From Swiss-Prot:
This is Sulfate adenylyltransferase. Keywords: ATP-binding, Nucleotide-binding, Nucleotidyltransferase, Transferase. Pathway: Sulfur metabolism; hydrogen sulfide biosynthesis; sulfite from sulfate: step 1/3. Belongs to the sulfate adenylyltransferase family. One of its GO terms (molecular function) is ATP binding. NCBIfam families: PRK04149.1 (NF003166), sopT (TIGR00339). It catalyses: sulfate + ATP + H(+) = adenosine 5'-phosphosulfate + diphosphate.
């Protein structure tokens, strides 16, 4: 059996990253263009366009695609797309840019020239409307809402040429991979069914259990961690990488998992982001996405299994990548094993509920971590990391993190 097709009607990867002489000449041309500064989120989105992770998109969305994506998860041409991919700027700068003009795209933090775009459309949006549709809230305390409300007032749309993958290939050498690279690895391993495990946390025992369930039913699992920006208090990607490496080395059969990373910032859009996670994992070659409790959520904005239910609400055939829906998992003292609500008949008092938030809070506050929460080799790495922190971040517990 072959791997799943890339997303879109043409079913072929569309990486927009330039190479060779074309890259040299286009970068030279871009030096004389007006510069549009990119936020961290926009830079990550541009890199995903570059490597084909956002196939079949050819650039940042125009108004019709923005509206369709926001309101019905469907672009103007009928392509399924659950979260808008947009680029914004100030009204003052937008007024200086003509339709049809090419602009240089520069990462605001590093100053690196990342690409160029031919501006085909300029439009304003109702940001609060986007937030209510995508995040199901316009509460400014929601980190994804804050991100959208703080962006520029005018969206610029058009096809892009991508010049760079930023620091990801060097900073995360051996982990950061493109869809072409993961597909090649899957084929070399003889895998046709591959489950993706989305993570922004070091893997505790519950995560390990989810991945092992997937290993039982698929040829392999891509442990696919986010390498872009998170919220304060989250654990950095290099620490997560080391934790996952030691876990897979000590507790998984060799050749059943691959660890990789992708360049996006977290949006914290809960169910909608779960759909986006499945969509781009299709481009990376994954037939399934593991969807556990409160996937891509934050705080108490979403129900623990809203991300399960949303896959039942999308049109049939919208995605080739299917969800592996797994119930609430925990360690049960009476079962003396990891279990789920489907497999364990015992009382809540007999269970140790595991969550990344809970683990971060215990480590941050120097508390003793219960024996069955995480593997000792993983805890050793995390304790070293927390011991080296000079500034502590207050980690708030939400209901899903404490088993409510």
């Amino acid at each position: 059996m072959a791997l799943v097709n890339p997303h879109g009607k043409e079913k072929v990867l569309k990486p927009l990253l330039l190479t060779g002489d074309e890259l040299v000449s286009e970068k030279e041309r871009a030096k004389s263009m007006k510069q549009v500064r990119l936020s961290s989120r926009e830079t990550g989105d541009l890199i995903m366009l570059g490597i084909g992770g956002f196939t079949p998109l050819t650039g940042f969305m125009g108004h019709a695609d923005w509206k369709g994506s926001v309101e019905t998860c469907t672009m103007a041409d009928g392509t399924f797309w659950p979260i808008p991919i947009t680029l914004s700027t100030s009204k003052e700068q937008a007024d200086t840019i003509a339709i049809g003009e090419e602009v240089a795209l520069v990462d605001d933090e590093s100053g690196e020239l990342m690409g160029s775009m031919k501006v085909e459309e300029k439009y304003c949006i109702d940001k609060a409307h986007e937030c209510r549709e995508v995040f199901k809230t316009d509460d400014p305390a929601h980190p994804g809402v804050l991100m959208v409300m703080n962006q520029g007032d005018v969206n610029l749309a058009g096809p892009v040429k991508v010049f760079s993958e930023g620091s990801f290939p060097t900073e995360f050498a051996g982990i950061y991979m493109t869809p072409a690279q993961t597909r090649k690895m899957f084929e070399e391993n003889g895998w046709s069914t591959v489950a993706a495990f989305q993570t922004r946390n070091p893997m505790h025992r519950s995560h390990e259990y989810l991945v092992k369930i997937a290993v039982e039913i698929c040829d392999g699992v891509l442990i696919h961690q986010l390498l872009g920006k998170l919220k304060p208090g989250d654990i950095p990607a290099d620490v997560r990488r080391d934790c996952i490496n030691v876990l897979t080395e000590k507790y998984f059969v060799k050749g059943t998992t691959i660890q990789a990373g992708y360049p996006l910032d977290m949006r914290y859009a809960g169910p909608r982001e779960a759909l986006l996670h499945a969509l781009f994992r299709q481009n990376f070659g994954c037939s399934h996405l593991i969807v556990g409790r409160d996937h891509a959520g934050v705080g108490d904005y979403y129900g623990p299994f809203d991300a399960h239910h949303i896959f039942d609400q999308i049109p049939e055939g919208a995605l080739e990548t299917k969800p592996l829906k797994i119930d609430w998992t925990f360690y049960c003292y009476k079962c003396d094993a990891m279990a789920s609500m489907k497999t364990c008949p015992h009382e809540p008092a007999d269970r140790l509920n595991l969550s990344g938030t809970k683990l971060r809070k215990m480590l941050s506050e120097g508390e003793e971590v219960p024996e069955h929460f995480s593997r000792p080799e993983v805890l050793e790495i995390l304790r070293r990391y927390y011991a080296g922190l000079t500034e502590k971040v207050d980690i708030k517990m939400h209901s899903h993190a404490i088993g409510k």
